[in-house]
Amino acid sequence: AFVWVANRSTSTSTLYDGAGVPQSLVVSIPPGVAGNARPTGIVFNGHSDFMVTANGMSGASAFIFAGLGGTLSGWSPGVDQTHAITVFDGGNAGAVYTGLALASRGASDFLYAADFRNATVDMFDAAFNKVGGAGSFVDQALPPGYAPYGIQAIGERVYVWYARQGAQTGVAVPGAGQGAIDVFGTAGNLVKRLVAPGGALHPPWGMAVGA
């Protein structure tokens, strides 16, 4: 088994084997209008959509990255083995993506990017077009200052975890009780509050589900 890691400081992604040994492949994530990509979220795409094109070649993205620079980038080894291709740039809108998820709804696939700065979850179709209404992924009961910080799709549910926005862009306020988790449907409808603010959570970012 291999593990892909998104490297925020170098705007790259590196590959490791199951023993933690780095492999020779290093993928560069291109900058956007707001500067370096600084990838934080990475998802595997096992389908034939989310196409990227460069140098006269097209192919489905095997991995898709989101980052603090507000970009989405897709990597297809048949298009460019060592570089991802920018497919969306939200830098002019101030987007700061701190997490990324991929889920299916019916026969269609969608990406979900947690925009910590603008306090939204941006939803994209399989052609990287932003979709979804203004009321998607909204919890009116959250206290002011909370924003989506991480995201994970599990089955037909999208789990969004929140943190309080700090003074520095993309950095959450630390401390116990500063985190919250909501559960949404893949269309962005709120299903339930899983963990309320003021509980045991520090700002949560990752989630894993045991078999």
For each feature predicted by the language model, list its residue ranges.
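Hydrophobic/aromatic beta-strand positions that recur at structurally equivalent sites within the blades
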Residues: Y16-G18, W75, F124, F184
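Beta-propeller blade signature
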Residues: F124, A176-A187
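Structural signal for beta-propeller blades
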Residues: S11-T14, L72, A119-V121, I181
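A short beta-strand motif characteristic of beta-propeller blades
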Residues: Q23-V33, Q81-G91, K130-L142, N189-G199
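Beta-propeller domains
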Residues: V5-S28
